[in-house]
Amino acid sequence: MNGVFDLGGTDGIGPVDPPAEEPVFRADWEKAAFTMFSALFRAGWFGIDEFRHGVEKMDPALYLKSPYYKHWIASFEYHGKRTGKLDLAELDRRTQYYLANPDAPLPEHGPNQELIDFANAVVPSGAPAIRPTDKEPRFKIGDVVRMSSDVPFGHTRIAGYVRGKVGRVISHHGSFVYPDSAGNGRGDDPQHLYTLQFDATELWGEQYAEPNVTTTFDAWDPYLTLVTAPEGAAA
């Protein structure tokens, strides 16, 4: 889907200028948000692609002016409502209570060893998204392919700046969870994943592209159509 979250190639944003010593967390509540992700993921509120789509569902103005972990909280709320696991009226009541009573103690919970073990296993290295498939890869290294120009209404990993652009396959990684399916609640639907290389002139035009610059982009099989195969290879 289109949205303010897809800023690649957008004009008028200015340079990316992160602080030299940016802290991991800017406030204590961000630490809580970070830990909530593992708990809610483990509890089945969302998969990683569904989580991203929950962020994409944010009000655009709020998205642009809110800090990073506020995006996480918004996705938690979205999926809590979607799955029926969160009572938004109760959430509002508790929020108002703590706003009125900022020194009130938070509810206490004992440690959940299963969740701790899960977080210790997943947080440092992530959860693998590799999935087997009986489908054969449609493309080979060296193939010249065109990215889809479709604009799906739901979640996708096709960035706006590569839609309809022509690049070359430089790597094939195997089959992985397909975000356009998993992110929209339709299951893993494993698809082959490739890395494409684009000339800067293809992406930005002759007038603005830096000379001899290329950009790589990971793309799933359904995003692509063949333009030309390498000489001597079967199309």
Swiss-Prot record:
Record bears the keyword Cell membrane: no
Applications (biotechnology): Industrial production of acrylamide is now being developed using some of these enzymes.
Keyword annotations: Lyase
One of the record's GO molecular function terms: nitrile hydratase activity
Enzyme class (EC, first level): lyase
Quaternary structure (record): Heterodimer of an alpha and a beta chain.
Function, in words: NHase catalyzes the hydration of various nitrile compounds to the corresponding amides.
NCBIfam families hit by this protein: nitrile_beta (TIGR03888)
Record family assignment: Belongs to the nitrile hydratase subunit beta family.
Stated name of the protein: Nitrile hydratase subunit beta
